[in-house]
Amino acid sequence: MVRKRKLGASASCEAEDANCAENAIDRFSNLPDEVAHRILSFLSFKDLTRVGAVSKRCRQFHLSVPVVSFDYSSCKPRGVTNQKIVKLMSSLDRYLRYRGDHRMQVFSINWSCFGSEQASKFFRVITWIVNAVRCNVEVLDLRLACDFLALPSCVFLSKSLQSLSVHLTWMILEAPSVSFSSNLCYLKLEKVTIVDERFFK
C-alpha cells in the first residue's frame, strides 16, 4: 500500500514537472520578438544554440537574435584537439548559414585558438566577418590571436557598420588596398601593428 502511494506520488510529481516545463516554454515562446531577443542577447553562443534546440519558435528567436557573441573561452571543448576546434568552428558556420539575412546589430568574436592548419581557420574567421557584414552588422568587435589580419574590403564599404574594434596580440593589421569611404563613427585598435596609413586616410 505504501509502495503504491509512493509510486502515485512520484508519477504525480513527474507530471507536474512536465507541465511546469511545458508552461515555461510556452511563456517564453509567446514573448514579443524584441523581448525574447533582449533576453537572448546576454547568452553565450553555446547557450544560445541550446535555446534554439528547444522548439521551433525558440529556433526562430535563436536565428534572428540581433546580438551574437562567439567567445572561444566560454565554449571551448575539454581536452582541446584540432578536430574539436574544427567542430566548434563548424557550429558557427552552420549558424550563420541558417541565419540567412536576419539583421545583426552586434557581432563579437573572441578567438584565441587557431592551432594547426591556421590558414584554413583564418579563412573561416574572415567568412564569419563577411557574413556579419551581409547581415548589416552595426557593431563589430574582433579579439583574435593570429599572426596577421587583413580585413576584407566589405567591412569598410559597409553602409551599416558604425563601430569597429580590433584587438590583436601585437600582430599586423592591414587595411584593404582599394580606396574606400567608410561610415564608421567609432574605431578602436588595440595591440595592433599598422602596416601603412590607409586606415587613417
Whereabouts are the PLM-identified features?
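Leucine-rich repeat
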Residues: V2, A18-K201
